[in-house]
Structures are given as C-alpha cells and as structure tokens.
C-alpha cells in the first residue's frame, strides 16, 4: 500500500487558484509512489482529524495568502497579503498530529512559513532585495540557492550543477526570520542571504521545508528527489512502527 500524503487545499477563498496549483503537488507525490489525500478547509476539526489520522506524512503547499502576523506578535506590513484563517487552522491540525506522531513533514513556500510560525518563529513580511524572489510561474529559474553541505537537504538534492548549489524558481515575498523551535536554516540565497530552506533538528523526525516550488519542475531530479525523500521517510516510519508492533 503506498504511503498516504496529506495535502491541504492551498487556499479557502480562491477555488480557481487551488485547483490550478493543487494537482501539481498531487502529481509530484504520485511520481514517487505515494497517494495524495486532499484535506478540505471547510470541514469541522473532527472531520479533518479523521482524514489526517489515516495519512502517513504531511505536505504543506504554497498559498496566495500570508500568515497572519498577529500569530508571531508583529504589526502588519502594508504589503502583507490577507490571511487565510481556514488554511491556518488546518495547517495547525496537520502539524500538531505530525509532531505528536512523528510523521514526516514537507513544507513548500507558504508551507515553510506556516511551519516556522507554528514552531514559534517569525517572518520577514516583505523582502527588500534586488533578487526577484517574487518572479512567479513564468520564470523557471529565478536565482540560485546555496545548501549547507552537512544538511539532510544536501544529501537529498545531490546537485549535479556544482557542490550543494541549485537553481530554483521563486514565488514569494516573505521569508523566515527568527527560526522556530527544533528547526535550523540549511539553505540561503547567496546573493542576499534570504533563508531558502529549513529542516528539523531531531534525527528521528523528518521535517524539511523549502521556499521554492519543486512541484513545478519534477522533470528535474533535484526537485523530484525532495518529494522522494518525504515518501521514503513515510515508508521508513511505517516499517519501524510495523516492527515495533510485531515485537510486542
């Protein structure tokens, strides 16, 4: 049975945006042998939890919203987009379950920001940089990312371009600032120092988040490898739990 990956609907207020972006995430996990499970934003917490409990891992996708700055005790920047409280609530349920049950987590773009705030981190609400971090879908390569050599991400990506450097797309205007509990910075944009990836510090819990959109470039091995790492972590967790059950 393939691992089931919980993916929340990206945005509660824009069905067209959600239906345009969500299939890319679903296809990305299907390509590496997993089953995507859509998590609705308009159901009761009890209904959502029943779906979440059936899943083996979590993928937090991007969104056109911004995390409510009140969640990290900040005043709203004039360029901060409206929040999506329904998405925030579902993300919190997903992350609470993932941390309680040690389920693997992958955050992408908004998903990185949501994860960091959940772990009591803060965000840069609007990046002031000459680098075009908000390049969007029409720009396949926006800038490069330098990955820490000793990180899990470096071992996952194994970049052929040059050691621990990859070229990425980019569709964000916010970034992690103060890093949340149990997370560490593992990649930055070398041109301006903007944080581009985080991962968990616990060796027995797979947590990875990237600021770019690997689901848009799954024909490239570094992008596909990111999703493969999530699925492999989900399989490893399942095998470990099965072994513990059999030994009882």
Model-derived regions, located:
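Hydrophobic, aromatic-enriched interface-forming segments
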Residues: 112-114
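Active-site-proximal beta-strand elements of phosphoester/diester hydrolases
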Residues: 208-212
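Conserved G/P- and acidic residue-centered "switch" motifs that form tight phosphate/ATP-binding loops
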Residues: 109
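N-terminal beta1-alpha1 cap of cysteine-dependent amidohydrolase-like domains
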Residues: 1-106, 116-117, 124, 128-167, ...
């Amino acid at each position: 049975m393939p691992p089931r990956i919980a993916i929340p609907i990206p945005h509660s207020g824009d069905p067209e945006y959600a239906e345009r972006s969500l299939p890319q995430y679903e296809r990305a996990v299907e390509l590496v042998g997993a089953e995507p499970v859509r998590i609705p934003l308009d159901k009761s917490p009890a209904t959502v939890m029943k779906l979440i409990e059936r899943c083996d891992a979590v993928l937090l996708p991007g969104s056109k919203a911004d995390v409510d700055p009140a969640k990290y005790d900040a005043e709203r920047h004039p360029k901060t987009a409206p929040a999506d409280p329904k998405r925030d609530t579902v993300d919190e349920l997903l992350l609470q379950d993932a941390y309680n049950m040690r389920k693997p987590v992958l955050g992408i773009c908004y998903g990185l920001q949501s994860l960091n705030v959940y772990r009591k981190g803060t965000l840069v609400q609007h990046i002031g940089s000459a680098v075009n971090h908000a390049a969007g879908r029409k720009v396949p390569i926006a800038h490069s990312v330098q990955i820490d050599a000793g990180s899990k991400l470096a071992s996952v990506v194994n970049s052929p371009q040059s050691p621990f450097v990859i070229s990425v797309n980019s569709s964000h205007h916010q970034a992690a600032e103060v890093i949340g509990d149990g997370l560490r910075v593992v990649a930055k944009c070398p041109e301006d120092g903007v944080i581009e990836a985080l991962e968990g510090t616990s060796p027995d819990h797979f947590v990875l988040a990237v600021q770019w959109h690997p689901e848009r470039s799954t024909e490239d091995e570094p992008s596909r490898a990111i999703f493969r790492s999530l699925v492999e972590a989900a399989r490893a967790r399942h095998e470990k739990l099965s072994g513990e059950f059999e030994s009882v």
